[in-house]
């Protein structure tokens, strides 16, 4: 048996790889084992399985998503622990890049073999390897780096075996809340079940409030005589505030439960949602509190002895203070689950609706708490970046969340030769560094506020590395970079993250209703002005209007009521031109200047002279509405109707626009004439995916819509008509309906709608061409469906945007708390679980 297969068998015995993982299949290749180990997560868990607590998993990034920086950090943690705690020699250890870049996977197997023969590993009773003469497999390791896919999605099942500290805290919580079993009637009615739910809500609240009282009475007060005031504040945070709030909450809960049918219980939860916001502070600091407690107890034996004494008095030594400090976080995440069960067994329609309001409030609170924890992890990641980058004199946390990092090649206006660089991309900045061992030397700091991304595939060669490139261009055209990537897939991954970062800086609807929304970090927990739900996390939780200071989620910007201060002049702040321009746009139709058609492309070279303004990107066929133009001047200003951007361009790149005669659409196989949505759905429901039609809207004969069958559903896309042009997105406009359809027959709709990754394939009047698809062995498992209750706007490419009413296929519930993995229209990603209603048909 090949050595790598023996290694796989050993990893399964160590409970690191699932027994059914694809690396065990008959046709498995060694590259699949390499891919499973590359991020270092399973290797760190391996050491903890062999020697409990060998590695503090708080120091391991459990979801590195193939970030080179985080993966290498995990791998180096594994290697240093092998040396320090398992006694491996330096010569027995592989180098970090031997695994991450798969430069020498044979050495990785050799290290794992040496680990399997250590006394610690053998004490687990697991047979080391090799135990038999292995087939020579040195040849299969060569060329592995070319087979590894840097863009592969995480295999969620792989991480089932990774310890979860939250689950550990959950066990303490469940133990504390456990009640004596109550005799149940042999056949329970819905009323009986509802009574059980109400009883559980009250009993667990009583026990939780007692637990808070015990922490204060048996730990906090006795330790005040041993610890400095600042130590007490760090360790116990705002426990006393939590106790006060829950004492009142329990009193009002009991009063509500005493009413017939507990009909006012929902009001208590809604009322206390705002008071429970103090959990934001507690949950953001509890991890630091636990670490500080450990440090103090380790440094002072008298404190350690006092902690043991306190634990004995409080609960006979069953739970330590460290255990109990995790309970508040667990409790606040349980309210929505308790209410969800109560809603399920409530029959009265009005009571059910009222309880749903309480359920929404507690779901929102739980999601807010989960995002605080998630952001704490993100801030740790940013701190690791910060400490590893030399010559960096500003805080990276001011530039948003990390999006992607890794190696690339780069050219700039100053240096045309390709340079090897390492880049870190955040929401608002790109850091270009030179790697020096484990550290990075900052070479350039690019503020993305003034840059745009443009694809350039002209020099790409499929089988040639580092030919896949896109441009990063400054708005003024004075500075720019060419970024080169090893593979087309990596280029696509980076480009998507750049586009997501820029959309976070300049989101759609940022200037809707007279507002001026910008990304913002709120110091206090804040609710969205549009949907009233909480803004999530600890930094850059959402957007704030620079004028009226209204807070909002990214997905809610278009629904915020009109700005209360839209009449004020804020022209002193220069901003990137984006859709929905305000004062300038209102004047443009009053100027009486003609429209022009672009006859030659222009991308900023040569740049506009002096400092007259930004350049305007032009593509042949675009229509430009002039805003400043004099016949004797070589440079004109205009608005590109296709993109809504405003800027300057050479006048010789355009010609007068001539509006053509109306098109005869009936000759096209895709044109259906006047038709409602229902008619389109009846035609397309039983057709193949990709079948489409264009219909005239019955209510307004001047408007059209595309209906397309995609992923078993019929989707409808409104075609907007204005200024003689047709468009389905503000990014691109067409002179005619035929041109629009022809374009999207060749180009995917996902550029307009991220979840609609298809072209317009089959006109509905064509004969059906149905292919028989056999289910593949690796087809995706689905754990049910859910209906989106609200819009959700993804912040990076790992997340899944939702529109209210979307039906989501649930693929996984094992992500970070509060996040599920799902699929819509072929697009897969993570979304907040409180934004959907699972098994919604039962409650609708």
From Swiss-Prot:
Post-translation changes: Phosphorylated by FYN. Phosphorylated on tyrosine residues by HCK in response to IFNG and bacterial lipopolysaccharide (LPS).
GO terms under biological process: cell migration; G protein-coupled receptor signaling pathway; immune response-regulating cell surface receptor signaling pathway; integrin-mediated signaling pathway; natural killer cell activation; natural killer cell mediated cytotoxicity; neutrophil chemotaxis; phagocytosis
Domain PH: 401-503
UniProt keyword list: Guanine-nucleotide releasing factor, Metal-binding, Phosphoprotein, Proto-oncogene, Repeat, SH2 domain, SH3 domain, Zinc, Zinc-finger
Species, as recorded: Bos taurus
Domain-related comment: The DH domain is involved in interaction with CCPG1.
Region (Disordered): 567-589
Stretches assigned to the DH domain: 193-372
Calponin-homology (CH) domain boundaries: 1-119
Protein name according to UniProt: Proto-oncogene vav
One cellular component term from this protein's GO annotations in UniProt: cell-cell junction
Assembly information from the UniProt record: Interacts with SHB. Interacts with APS, DOCK2, GRB2, GRB3, DOCK2, SLA, TEC and ZNF655/VIK. Interacts with SIAH2; without leading to its degradation. Associates with BLNK, PLCG1, GRB2 and NCK1 in a B-cell antigen receptor-dependent fashion. Interacts with CBLB; which inhibits tyrosine phosphorylation and down-regulates activity. May interact with CCPG1. Interacts with CLNK. Interacts with THEMIS2. Interacts with NEK3 and this interaction is prolactin-dependent. Interacts with ITK. Interacts with PTK2B/PYK2. Interacts with HCK. Interacts with PTK2B/PYK2. Interacts (via SH2 domain) with SYK.
GO MF: guanyl-nucleotide exchange factor activity; phosphorylation-dependent protein binding; phosphotyrosine residue binding; zinc ion binding
Positions of modified residues (Phosphotyrosine): 825, 843
Residues of the SH2 domain: 670-764
Note from the entry: 'Vav' stands for the sixth letter of the Hebrew alphabet.
Function as written in the Swiss-Prot or TrEMBL entry: Couples tyrosine kinase signals with the activation of the Rho/Rac GTPases, thus leading to cell differentiation and/or proliferation.
SUPFAM superfamilies: Calponin-homology domain, CH-domain, DBL homology domain (DH-domain), PH domain-like, SH2 domain, SH3-domain
Phorbol-ester/DAG-type zinc finger segments: 514-563
Residue intervals of the SH3 domain: 591-659, 781-841
């Amino acid at each position: 048996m090949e050595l790598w297969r023996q290694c796989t068998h050993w990893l399964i015995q160590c409970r690191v790889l699932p027994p059914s993982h694809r690396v065990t299949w008959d046709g498995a290749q060694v590259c699949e084992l390499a891919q499973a180990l590359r991020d270092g997560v399973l290797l760190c868990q391996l050491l903890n399985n062999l020697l409990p607590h060998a590695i503090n998993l708080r120091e391991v990034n459990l979801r590195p998503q193939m970030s080179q920086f985080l993966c290498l950090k995990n791998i180096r943690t594994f290697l240093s622990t092998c040396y320090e705690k398992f006694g491996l020699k330096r010569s027995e250890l592989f180098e970090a890049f031997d695994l991450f870049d798969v430069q020498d996977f044979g050495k990785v197997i050799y290290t794992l073999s040496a680990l399997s023969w250590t006394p610690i590993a053998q004490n687990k009773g697991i047979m080391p390897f090799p135990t038999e003469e292995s087939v020579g497999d040195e040849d299969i390791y060569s060329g592995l780096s070319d087979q590894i896919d840097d863009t592969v999605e995480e295999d969620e099942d792989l991480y089932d075996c990774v310890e979860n500290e939250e689950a550990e805290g959950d066990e303490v919580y469940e133990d504390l809340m456990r009640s004596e079993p109550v005799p149940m009637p042999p056949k329970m009615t819905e009323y009986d079940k509802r009574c059980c739910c109400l009883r559980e809500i009250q009993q667990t609240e009583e026990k939780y409030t007692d637990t808070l009282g015990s922490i204060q009475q048996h730990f906090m007060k006795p330790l005040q005589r041993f610890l400095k005031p600042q130590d007490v504040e760090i360790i116990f945070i705002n426990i006393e505030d939590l106790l006060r709030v829950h004492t009142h909450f329990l009193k009002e809960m009991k009063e509500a439960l005493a009413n017939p049918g507990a009909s006012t219980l929902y009001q208590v939860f809604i009322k206390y949602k705002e008071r429970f916001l103090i959990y934001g502070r507690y949950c953001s600091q509890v991890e630091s509190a636990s670490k500080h407690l450990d440090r103090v107890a380790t440094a002072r034996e008298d404190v350690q002895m006092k902690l043991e004494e306190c634990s004995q008095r409080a609960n006979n030594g069953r739970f330590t203070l460290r255990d109990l400090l995790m309970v508040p976080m667990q409790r606040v995440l349980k309210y929505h689950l308790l209410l969800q069960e109560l809603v399920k067994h409530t029959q009265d329609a009005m009571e059910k609706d009222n309880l749903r309001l309480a359920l929404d409030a507690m779901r929102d609170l739980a999601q807010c708490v989960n995002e605080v924890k998630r952001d704490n992890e993100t801030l740790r990641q940013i701190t690791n970046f910060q400490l590893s980058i030399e010559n960096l004199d500003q805080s990276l946390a001011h530039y948003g969340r990390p999006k992607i990092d890794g190696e690339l090649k780069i050219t700039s206006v100053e240096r045309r030769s390709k340079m090897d660089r390492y880049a870190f991309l955040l929401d608002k900045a790109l850091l270009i560094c030179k790697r020096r061992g484990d550290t990075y030397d900052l070479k350039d700091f690019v503020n993305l506020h003034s840059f745009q991304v443009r694809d350039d595939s002209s020099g790409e060669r499929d089988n040639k590395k580092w030919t896949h490139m896109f441009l990063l261009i400054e708005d003024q055209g004075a500075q720019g970079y060419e970024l080169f990537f090893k593979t087309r897939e990596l280029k696509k991954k980076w480009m998507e993250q750049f586009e997501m970062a820029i959309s976070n800086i300049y989101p759609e609807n940022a200037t809707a209703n007279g507002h001026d929304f910008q990304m913002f970090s709120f110091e206090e927990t804040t609710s969205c002005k549009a949907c009233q739900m909480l803004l999530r996390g600890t930094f850059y939780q959402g957007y704030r209007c620079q004028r009226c200071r209204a807070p909002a989620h990214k997905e809610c910007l278009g629904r915020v009521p009109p700005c209360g201060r839209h009449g004020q002049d804020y022209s002193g702040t220069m901003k990137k031109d984006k859709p929905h321009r305000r004062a300038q746009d209102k004047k443009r139709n009053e100027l009486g200047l003609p429209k022009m058609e672009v006859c030659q492309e222009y991308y900023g070279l040569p740049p506009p002279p002096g400092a007259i303004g930004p350049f305007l990107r032009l593509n042949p066929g675009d229509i430009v509405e002039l805003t400043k133009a004099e016949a004797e001047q070589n440079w004109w200003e205009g608005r590109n109707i296709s993109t809504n951007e405003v800027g300057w361009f050479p006048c010789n790149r355009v010609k007068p626009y001539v509006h053509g005669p109306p098109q005869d659409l009936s000759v096209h196989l895709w044109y259906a004439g006047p038709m409602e949505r229902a008619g389109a759905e009846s035609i397309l429901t039983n057709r193949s995916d990709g079948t489409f039609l264009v219909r005239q809207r019955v209510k307004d004969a001047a408007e059209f819509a595309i209906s397309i069958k995609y992923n078993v559903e019929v989707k409808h896309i409104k075609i907007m008509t204005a200024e003689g042009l047709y468009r389905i997105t503000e990014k691109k406009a067409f002179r005619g309906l035929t041109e629009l359809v022809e374009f999207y027959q060749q180009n995917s709709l996902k550029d307009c709608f991220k979840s609609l990754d298809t072209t317009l394939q089959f006109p509905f009047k064509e004969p059906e061409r149905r292919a028989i698809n056999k289910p593949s062995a690796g087809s995706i498992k689905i754990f049910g469906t859910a209906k989106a209750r609200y819009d959700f706007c993804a912040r990076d490419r790992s997340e899944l945007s939702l529109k209210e009413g979307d039906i989501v296929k649930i693929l996984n519930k094992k992500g970070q708390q509060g996040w599920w993995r799902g699929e819509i229209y072929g697009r897969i990603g993570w979304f907040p679980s409180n934004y959907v209603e699972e098994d919604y048909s039962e409650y609708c």
